[in-house]
Amino acid sequence: MGYKEVHAAWQADPEAFWMDAADAIDWDTKPSKALFDDNAPLYEWFVDGKTNTCWNAVDRHVEAGHGDRTAIIYDSPVTHTKHTITYGELQTRVASLAGALRTKGIEKGDRVIIYMPMVPEALEAMLACARLGAIHSVVFGGFAAHELAVRIDDATPKAIIAASCGIEPGRVVHYKPLLDGAIDQAAHKPDFCVIFQREQEVAHLDKGRDVDWHAFQYGVEPADCVPVAGNHPAYILYTSGTTGQPKGVVRPTGGHMVALHWTMKNIYNVEPGDVYWAASDVGWVVGHSYICYAPLLYGCTTVVFEGKPVGTPDAGTFWRMIEEHKIKVLFTAPTAFRAIKREDPKGELVGNYDLSSLQSLFLAGERADPDTIEWAQRLLKVPVIDHWWQTETGYAIAANPLGIEELPVKIGSPSVSMPGWDVQILDEAGHPVPPGTLGAIAVKLPLPPGTLPTLWNAEARFRKSYLDHFPGYYETGDAGYVDEDGYLYIMARTDDVINVAGHRLSTGAMEEVLAAHPDVAECAVIGVTDQLKGQLPLGFLCMNAGADRDAQEVVGEVVKSVRDQIGPVAAFKLAVVVDRLPKTRSGKILRGTMVKIADGAEFKMPATIDDPVILDEIRDALQTLGYART
């Protein structure tokens, strides 16, 4: 069956489609049906089933005789460490950790915050929570104390599992003082903290509250898997809301496993035992879904990489990883490839490695500009697949389903909506628009299994954020269009569609033009306030390493390119060359913050920012164009 047939089968009978997919999961009690719609528009899936995520991700592979298969490859260029963990070893380690947590009083429904770097123990902590039916909330290691405190107060965890430190290129990030500061600030106090001591820094433990990761496991009975209901929250993952309180996305246990398991073969086209590498972080949704859960649910080998695409030690790190670990599928953010391309524009380092194991490259997290996709296609000679999803959804809304059928790639499009997703482009009034017309991207309810059923302790906010604007739909917050072949194009966040003298224009389309310039490594376009036209586009350009060009000349060339390719209507005349762009740690460019700086508006320092100093550089650059007036 090709894509059209599979999609049609889902449309004809979604209930049968998802019940069939649910057969791939071990259930203690099979669900009586897939969709539970008695509380619409709040839908739930597999509610009356009973199952356990850790059993499905670890124990069942051991039971099936695959205990010797590698579950986790740990490769840490920042600490010069490598080791592997088999499924059998993982089962022993997770059961022991879960037993120790249980002895300290952790049980089904309790929340546990995990504050860890990219080490296998982070996955073990997640799985140990799942084993007990506890609800984990992973917070990106090294996150500021205030932000951690806000999450402690929202999730009210009984315990926090943390590492003593994280390692960034050239520096040690001290986690324990951040954790202590967060607990001091938080109104809610955890009963205890488990500290994984790394040899790079041994943290001081607070007597009575903190226990050592290894010591508290001594002599403890290992824990068995606790069955939970299909709609039991597997985890809470906070996505930084643009204002105020972070939003706690809830992930339901049953649908999460069914959907992720389905994607491994159908989208990524892997088999059990294949090596799958999502080069992300466990603190983000990609790390939850595709470092921890999906590869292990499917019986693959997952990769925990503690390093960066460049600088650990060079722009060849990804290629070394692929050769050394025989990686079949690589999934990363376009930002990572832009960083590699900036350091090694001609891709000369690729030739030093044997990449024959690589079957495909998947990109998500930021719009993948055509220039980056073409560069990767040319060098890697494998399908380069952009796909689109959100923290809220947990897996792809639109993709090229390589395991069903490799569809023609249209550069600039994450291809087509996956079974389960009825994607519609709507105008302001909520009416579907014809192909080729820019509008708000929405998904007709119900959303498929594994997506967020609500926000943690914030149902009213869930409805307001996602359901109220377009009744009967989930509002994605992205803007784009669908072409006549059904391919989706994501042009910008709805906030990044700018209005220039009454014309609605996508900043993403302008970024594509800028990125295509041979000397430009990376770029961003924002809309700044203009008395005459309402808004004007303004571009930021980062140059390739070794590009010895006059900045003003390059600015002149990109201004001309936008005029030629989008037209004078874009009114694109403002651009400035900068050393780097402000980003979140997951690689998303902070366009909204740059807009506020340009307009001289008040802004809150984004919690997820990688390096706050960059905002000062952006302000200085904007002042040369007469913006960011204070």
Segments from the language model and where they lie:
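Conserved AMP-binding/adenylate-forming core of the ANL superfamily
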Residues: C54, I72-L127, A144, L148-A149, ...
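Conserved pre-ATP/AMP-binding loop-to-beta segment of ANL
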Residues: D68-T70, C193-F196, L205-Y238, Q245, ...
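Structural core segment of the AMP-binding/adenylate-forming
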Residues: L127, R131-A215, A333-P334
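AMP-binding/adenylate-forming catalytic core of the ANL superfamily
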Residues: V139-C165, L179, E323, L330, ...
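AMP-binding/adenylate-forming catalytic domain of the ANL superfamily
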Residues: D191, I195-Q197, L532-Q535, D564-I589, ...
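Conserved AMP-binding/adenylation subdomain of ANL enzymes
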Residues: M257-V275, V285-K328, R342-E348
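Gly/Ser/Thr-rich phosphate-binding loop
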Residues: C300, K328-T332, K341-P408, D422
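Conserved ATP/PPi-binding loop(s) of AMP-dependent carboxylate-activating enzymes
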Residues: V416-G420, H431-Y466, L505-T507, E602-F603
